[in-house]
Amino acid sequence: EELNRIHDVINIFEDVDTYYSLGEGNTSLIEAGSTLKNYCGSENIFLKNETQNPTWSFKDRGTFSCVCFAKALNESVTATISTGNMGNSTAAYGSRAGLKTAVFLPHYTPEEKISAIGIHGAEIFKIKTDNYSDMKKAILNRAEKLGIRVVSGNGPIRVEGYKSTAFELF
């Protein structure tokens, strides 16, 4: 229902297949506590409770868009580089869409996050690294050579999914 309401402004492709949705969005607003209100000097502060999304993260909004885009391009694989939350979201939505999913994580990623990713059937690659940026560059270069599009936390397709937050506020 939420996707149908905002379809005209999230225009990454003509037809959004809501089958790939896991129920992201339409999260509630929570009134901020007095500490935050006092710190900001305002009595009118509300917070979006994005933990109500399927993988407990705002990233689900963008991942839905990325998965729909991958399906529109007839891709069979989706991949991401993550320290946990993005990997979990990509694994969940990739599974829903029937995509083979690869998640690249630094070796120091907590096991709790790795387990959450694993339950969705993603292929997990733990990379020994001391520098996340270097790891990311190396993976992106390799993925490009293999013809695999890696979804990131700030790509334009992902941002289309984040638009839904603004529309829920108005």
Where are the language model's segments positioned?
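PLP-dependent amino-acid enzyme catalytic core
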Residues: 1-170
